[in-house]
C-alpha cells in the first residue's frame, strides 16, 4: 500500500481523524469502555444510516445517544415503544387552530436529528410502519402533506432480547432498513469500577459541549462518498453478500440492499480511519454489523443457537479476501 501513503483524508476544521477523535473522547467521558460502539454510531451517521442495538436494559444506550447528539450539536428525542404508541405520537398530528380556522401541523419527535426509539418491538406494526417511512424516505406524511425530516437524521432503535412477551418482532423488510446492528454489552470489572468512581458524584453529560456541528456532518458525508473502492474489493463485497444466500442454515440471505449498505459502511469506516480508499480489512470489520441482522436463519440453526452474526463470520472464513496490491 506504499502508493497510498499520501492518500489521506485532508483535514480542516471539523473534519478528519482529529474531529472524530474529539467526538469519541466526548463519548468516553460519559460511557466508559464503549469506543467500538461509538465508532460504529459515528460510521452510521457518516454513511446516512440507522442503527439497531439489541441489548439488555441499563447498559447506557440512552446516555450514549444523548452524548452523541450533544457532541454534534444535534437535536435529540427519545420515543418509548409501547403497545399504545400511535403513529401520530411518532410523526406528529394536525391540530385545529381556532385563531386561523385551519389545521396546523404539530411535528412529532421523529423530526429531530437523532431519534432514540427504545424497545421498538413493543410498538405495534402500524406504528413501526410509520417509523419505517421516516427512516427510508426521510420524510413523514400527515393528512396528505409531506414534511421532510431534519438533516443529518439518524434513528437508533433498541430491542431487549430477554423480554419478548407482548412484543411485535420487526419484519425482515424493516430490519433491512437498519444499516448496522450492534450490542453495547456489560462493562468490564475495571470499567464498571471507573464508572462508579467517576459518575457517582457528578454527571459529565450535563456539561458536555459540542465539538462538531450538523454542517461538519454534512461535510463528512460528502467526503466519505468520495472514498475510493478498488474493483477487486467491490467484487469481494459482492461475493460475501452472495455467499450468505448459499450457506447451509440460512433460510434467507442478504438482499441487494445489503450490498449497497456494505459499500456505504466501508467507505465511512475507511474515512473515519483517515483514508481515502477502502481496504479488505474494512470490509471484514463491517461485515458482521452490516449483514448479521439481515439474515433469516433456518429453524434447526436457531435451535442450536446459531445467529446471523455467526453465519457471517463463517462466510468471512470461506470467501477469500483479495491479497493483491490495490
Residue ranges of each PLM-predicted region?
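AAA+/P-loop NTPase substrate/partner-engagement loops
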Residues: 71-99
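AAA+/SF3 P-loop NTPase mechanochemical coupling elements
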Residues: 104-113, 142-159, 170-180, 257
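Walker A/P-loop
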Residues: 45-82
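Conserved AAA+/SF3 P-loop NTPase catalytic/coupling segment centered on the Walker-B
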Residues: 111-136, 150, 165-174, 186-194
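Conserved alpha-helical scaffold flanking the Walker A/P-loop in AAA+ ATPase domains
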Residues: 39-43, 96-116, 145
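C-terminal engagement/docking regions of AAA+ P-loop ATPases
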Residues: 8-11, 246-326
